[in-house]
Amino acid sequence: MHRNAFAFSRLLIVQQIIEGIDESISDFASYIPIGNVTKKLTLWQNQGAKISYLSSHLTLENVKKDEIVLKKFKFPKGTIFYRQKEEDWNLPIEKVKPDIIIEDDCESIGGKYQMTFPNLKPELQSKITSIVVKEFAGIDHLPDDINDLKDFATEL
C-alpha cells in the first residue's frame, strides 16, 4: 500500500485511492507491506509453496519498482508477472497456471471487474482456488498451513 496510508483505516485508504488525494499513491517504489505479509508468505514458501507475484503495472520500469519494494521488505523470492498494455488480467495467469490465487477485492478501482480470477476462462477457474481478501486488509487472517488455504476459497 502507499506509504502515507500506514496509520489509516482500511476504508479511509480505499477513499484515498478513489479520490486520489495522496501523492504517495503514485510513488510505487515507496510502497509498504500490509500487516505481516512477508512472514506469512515465507511460512508458506517454507512449506513448499512457489510464490509468484502479479503486478498491476504495465511497464517493466514500474515492475522494477515492485521488485525494489519486495527486496526492501524481504518478501520471499518469486517471479513478478505483469500484463502488457493491451493485455487482459487473465493472460499472465494463463501462463503461470497457479493452484491458488490470493487477490484483493479491488474495491477502490471497480470491484470484481478489475480482479483476475473472475476474468479467467471457466476451464481455468475450475483448476484454481480463488481466495479474495478485502482490499488493504492483508492476509494475516489466512491460515499458516498451506494445506488449509483451500478452506478459504471464495465463490464469485
Would you name each region that the model predicts?
Residues L12-Q15, L60-K65:
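A broad, low-specificity signal for short, low-complexity segments enriched in glycine/proline
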Residues N62-L156:
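C-terminal cap/substrate-recognition subdomain and adjoining C-terminal extension
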Residues H57:
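Residue-level signal for short, function-critical loop segments
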Residues Y31-I34, L60, R83:
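Short alpha-helix boundary/capping motifs
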Residues F6-F8, K50, T154:
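Intrinsic disorder/low-complexity segments
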Residues D22-I51:
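Short, acidic loop-to-helix structural element flanking the phosphoryl-transfer center
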Residues M1-E23:
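Asp-based phosphoryl-transfer active-site loop
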